[in-house]
């Protein structure tokens, strides 16, 4: 896709990257021609104009080394968060074709959660490959793996072996059910984990079935994000003089933790275990989405009375003619009034009507639209790298900004460089090549 207000960097401003190799000119979504490129507030612009920024020399986690074992879903997302913050991530990939690893775009990897890595290809069924993996682990601060419990132990790479060789190591383990328990060895996916957590039962319309919330709650929010948080906390402990340890991140527990506020509301008698009957699940007519006259949608959430009043004014409705906002018996009438009002104009017209207000109303944007929205454009919230529009690293650090994201590597693409940077000498790397292990330049 194309995005508006793009600045095409001069090729001299691209990256001749000594770490990743190759030249990477790029474009970034910015706020327009009149923006002050030196004001330091638009992080997307800073990313675009950095000239001397080796990918692993920037970011708040610069200097932290991570060994990631190839996986799908939450573990790569958690590792992406660390890599976006500047960690030096070496991913150990299986010896398969790059096309087997993820989506492609014009010959380049379009797997955004795989960005900012370097790849070493190892066949972990071979003792020589396991030996290389252990050498990397000895040099690492963090290991991330997302296999079923017991897999790493069977490979000879489990935490007991790893921590014996590197006592300061943080060993992150990402699973659905956790490392222990009667279901630990069972297969599953995001939807299964959030079903068992209790969260899925609360998502969906009144009288309808539970609805999958994409794979955001289990895989990413309750999985990879909490894995990264746990790893960072364990790193702080090590830097304070503590020992390395295992971080057991289970999506069932992570998803349940994301629902902590709901558990509190339930305990306080303010939540019904009936979908679509509560304030935050679409039960309240003033916390829901409404169709507009052109078949698009607006999202409304004016919980506070002062915001609610502004919304009514802009909708052309009078509070005096409607049931009280918090009178549940009147919610059906409120929903009818809001439905009729929003159908009276297009989404664009409603956007213009609510512009600048505190009514807590926003358009429901598609992904491509989100990258073009003026607010995101002004902040540089999206960036285009090798033809792939994607979110910039978040959160943003104003004192130690993240480097320009690099696309996910092909298998073994930068293995030789990664091994050299991690202390393997040229002779050792050449011996590994002779053994048939797949390293790139």
Predicted regions and their residues:
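Oxidoreductase and adenylate-handling cofactor-binding alpha/beta cores
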Residues: 197, 223-244, 257, 261-269, ...
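An anion-binding loop in the catalytic cleft
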Residues: 292-296, 337, 347-348, 393-441
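A glycine-rich dinucleotide-binding beta-alpha-beta segment and adjacent secondary-structure elements
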Residues: 355-405
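Conserved Rossmann-fold dehydrogenase catalytic segment
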Residues: 179, 208-218, 239-255, 275-282, ...
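N-terminal helix-loop segment corresponding to the beta1-alpha1 unit
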Residues: 37, 49-240, 410, 416-441
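Aromatic-enriched alpha-helical interface/lid elements that frame and gate functional surfaces
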Residues: 281, 285-357, 361
């Amino acid at each position: 896709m194309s995005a508006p207000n793009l600045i095409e960097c001069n090729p001299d401003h691209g990256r001749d990257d000594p770490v990743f190799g190759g030249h990477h000119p790029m474009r970034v979504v910015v706020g327009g021609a009149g923006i002050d490129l030196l004001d330091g507030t638009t992080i997307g612009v800073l990313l675009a104009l950095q000239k001397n920024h080796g990918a692993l020399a920037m970011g708040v986690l610069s200097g932290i080394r991570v060994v990631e074992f190839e996986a799908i879903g939450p573990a790569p997302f958690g590792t992406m968060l660390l890599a976006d913050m500047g960690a030096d991530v070496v991913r150990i990939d299986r010896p398969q074709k790059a096309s087997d690893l993820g989506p492609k775009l014009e010959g380049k990897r379009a797997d955004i959660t795989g960005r900012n890595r370097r790849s070493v290809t190892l066949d972990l069924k071979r003792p020589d490959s396991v030996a290389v993996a252990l050498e990397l682990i000895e040099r690492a601060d963090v290991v991330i793996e997302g296999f079923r419990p017991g897999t790493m132990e069977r490979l000879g790479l489990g935490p007991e072996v790893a921590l014996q060789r590197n006592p300061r190591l943080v060993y992150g383990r990402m699973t659905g059910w956790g490392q222990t328990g009667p279901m630990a060895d069972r297969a599953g996916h995001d939807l299964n984990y959030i079903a068992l957590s209790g969260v899925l039962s609360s998502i969906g319309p009144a009288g309808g079935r539970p609805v999958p919330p994409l794979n955001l709650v289990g895989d990413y929010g309750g999985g990879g994000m909490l894995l990264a948080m746990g790893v960072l906390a364990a790193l702080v402990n090590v830097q304070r003089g503590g020992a390395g340890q295992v971080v057991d991140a289970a999506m069932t527990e992570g998803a349940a933790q994301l629902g902590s506020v709901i558990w509190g509301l339930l305990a306080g008698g303010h939540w019904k275990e009936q979908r679509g009957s509560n304030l935050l699940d679409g039960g309240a007519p003033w916390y829901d989405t409404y169709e507009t006259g052109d078949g698009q949608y607006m999202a409304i959430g004016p919980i506070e009375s002062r915001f609610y009043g502004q919304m009514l004014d802009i909708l052309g409705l009078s509070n005096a003619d409607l049931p009280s906002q918090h009178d549940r018996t009147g919610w059906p009438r409120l929903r009818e009034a809001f439905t009729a009002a929003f159908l009276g104009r297009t989404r664009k017209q409603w956007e213009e009507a609510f512009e600048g207000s505190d009514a807590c109303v926003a358009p429901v944007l598609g992904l491509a639209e989100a990258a073009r929205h003026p607010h995101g454009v002004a902040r540089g919230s999206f960036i285009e790298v090798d033809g792939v529009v994607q979110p910039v690293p978040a959160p943003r650090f104003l004192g130690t900004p993240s480097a320009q994201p690099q696309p996910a590597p092909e298998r073994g693409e930068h293995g030789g460089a990664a091994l050299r940077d991690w202390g393997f000498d040229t002779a050792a790397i050449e011996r590994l090549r002779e053994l048939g292990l797949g390293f790139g330049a």
